[in-house]
Amino acid sequence: IDAEGDKCTNAIIFCNRKMDVDTVAKSLKKHGYDAAPIHGDLDQSQRTKTLEGFRNGDLRFLVASDVAARGLDVPSVSHVYNFDVPSHAEDYVHRIGRTGRAGRDGKAVMICVPKDEKNLADIESLVQKEIPRLENLLKSAKSEESKSETEAGKEDKKYTSRTRSRRSSNKSND
């Protein structure tokens, strides 16, 4: 979101599950972004209030489930972020159809992890177009940071010895 700067005037962020919609909206608010959730478990008055705030520009980020997005009429959405790859390729078309309306420019971004590759392939098959990939910037930043720390560590430990101990590699399923 930050990388887009002023180009991102407003955005809809899609999640596959209502629980994730709430979590993402809460996290964005915690980090200073003007965001609110919209999904079927919210009462109609709350959904109407949230949608009206998004339409009139009082709310910059709308975090939504697919069901909430169907029939959503917001004439000017600059960005769509797919927090999750949709399980059904048709949902992707509905999601990205929220941006770039009436001849306006719009941008859609999707976060895809290896377990979502099949769904991504289904989407590309449906739209008959390969979706461009961006380098994993977070992974690259960590790699550069690690490289810098390693170089700094070599300088700091020039005259010390290191011992290695073998540790168990129990991985948790986060």
Name each model-derived stretch.
Residues 1-142, 164-167:
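Conserved helicase RecA-like core
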Residues 142-174:
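Arginine-glycine-rich low-complexity intrinsically disordered regions
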